[in-house]
């Protein structure tokens, strides 16, 4: 049985367990070495989404473009 790759939404739901930016950065650092390049691109997209949520202290389905200026 082959595993199907996780989607951005799958990664985002897992990353929502991270309650602080520090924890999120630790998870990103760990996954940097464990995921393939294709999986990493999807993971980084979800991680950026979660970083925006943590920075604004709100959950978003889609991040408004105005929020990105607050993300480092």
Curated annotation (Swiss-Prot):
Additional observations: Hha and TomB may form a type II toxin-antitoxin (TA) system.
Disruption phenotype: Deletion results in a large increase in the production of extracellular and intracellular hemolysin. At low osmolarity minor changes in overall translation, at 0.4 M NaCl expression of about 25 proteins altered, including decreased OmpA, crr and AhpC (in strain 5K, not a K12 derivative). At 0.3 M NaCl in strain W3110 up-regulation of 113 genes and down-regulation of 8 genes was observed; a double cnu-hha deletion up-regulated 134 and down-regulated 5 genes, most of which are thought to have been acquired horizontally and are also up-regulated in double hns-stpA deletions.
A single GO BP: regulation of DNA-templated transcription
Domain notes: Histidine-tagging (His-tagging) at the N-terminus does not impair interaction with H-NS, whereas His-tagging at the C-terminus does impair interaction.
Effect on the protein upon substituting residue 10 to N: Does not affect H-NS binding ability
Record's protein name: Hemolysin expression-modulating protein Hha
Signal peptide: none
Any Pfam family: HHA
UniProt effect for mutating residue 39 to Q: Does not affect H-NS binding ability
InterPro entries reported in the protein's UniProt record: Hemolysn_expr_modulating_HHA (IPR007985), HHA_sf (IPR036666)
């Amino acid at each position: 049985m082959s595993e199907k790759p996780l989607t951005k939404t799958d990664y985002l739901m897992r990353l929502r367990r991270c309650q602080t930016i520090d924890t999120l950065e630790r998870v990103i650092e760990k996954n940097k070495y464990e995921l393939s390049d294709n999986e990493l691109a999807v993971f980084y997209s979800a991680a950026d989404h979660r970083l925006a949520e943590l920075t604004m202290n709100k959950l978003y389905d889609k991040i408004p473009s105005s929020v990105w200026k607050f993300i480092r």
